Amino acid sequence: MTPSIQIIFASQTGRNRAIAGHLQAQLASRAQTVITEISQVDAFALTQADAVIIVSYTYHDGDLPDEAQDFFEDLKEVDLKRTKFAVCGSSSKRHIHFGRAIDYLTIQFNSSNGEQVADSVKIDQDPDDADYQRLNQLAQNVLASLA
């Protein structure tokens, strides 16, 4: 049976939407994927997917994006029942707290009984070749966890 992977993104500039698209392309041959903007996601339904990948930016100096706030608050009340997950996204090293939203989301997914299957990936603004390699590895780790 083909595994299902939900890719959830928050994007202000389009970077993270593009990252979500890149991940979908990496996963498409071996999994059913759905890309959804984070404000449209029901955190209580995450366990319906075999795995979840969150792609988020960090707003200002370490904040979650506004559009991710409701999702994040709901996530605090969800039992993910060992749903596999990975977190990645873009930020700016000019911020005091580079990629802190990635950290917040990773911590909350773990606290909600998720199973982290790949190291979180933080990207400084637009991805370069090394970043794409790390994203490809994240995708491969998610797929391997479902085998």
Task: Mark where each language-model region is.
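Short acidic active-site motifs
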Residues: Q40-A45
